[in-house]
Design a protein with these regions (language model features):
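Composition-driven recognition of glycine/serine/threonine/acidic- and proline-rich low-complexity segments
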Residues: 2-177
Length: 177
């Protein structure tokens, strides 16, 4: 599965390689917990790859392979500030939803999100991000709480920008797994 996690860093225009490595390590720990949570939900082994961290202007990201996609965004409401945005290809979310329903069918080209599938996807992401927040809490030795996830379907760079809440020229820390 292809997924990309974006974290907007408003006050820090650039970060050092050591800071990028630290972000990658922390996210590897927290996303490892997320993968475990999804493994439990799906009753399947879920693995994540080693994260790749970069600082870039939002408009330089190429989302063409991710369209259409589901974006799930959470905000940190306690312990740390910022937000996380997970971007999933529609095909990957369909696989997750099929497995949740005990269905091993391959993804369908005519799949469209409806209210039920969006709600189910948000609940899966809530479980993932809740597990990640718990791992961050343990790592940082402080309480880390998140908002309820919000989800958006995106089909273009403009809809990505609107869903994530960035402006033209904003720098983000992009982490790909």
């Amino acid at each position: 599965m292809s997924e990309e996690l974006l974290q907007k860093e408003v006050s820090v225009p650039s970060i050092s390689m050591m800071e990028q490595d630290a972000i990658g390590e922390v996210l590897n720990i927290s996303m490892g917990s997320s993968a475990t949570a999804v493994s439990s939900l799906l009753d399947r082994q879920v693995n994540i790859s080693t994260p790749s961290v970069s600082v870039r202007e939002f408009h330089t990201l190429d989302y063409s392979a991710m369209e259409p996609a589901l974006i799930v965004k959470i905000e940190y409401v306690e312990g740390i500030s910022g937000n996380n945005v997970m971007v999933f290809r529609q095909r990957d979310i369909q696989i997750i939803l099929n497995l949740l329903m005990g269905n091993d069918d391959p993804p369908s080209d005519d799949f469209e999100f409806d209210e039920l599938s969006m709600s189910a996807a948000c609940e899966v992401m809530n479980q993932m991000m809740g597990a990640a927040a718990t791992a961050l809490s343990e790592f940082l030795n402080r309480v880390v709480n998140i908002s309820t996830p919000t989800a958006s379907i995106v089909t273009s760079e403009d809809s990505y920008r609107d869903a994530i809440g960035v402006q033209e020229g904003d720098e983000i820390v992009a982490v790909s797994f």
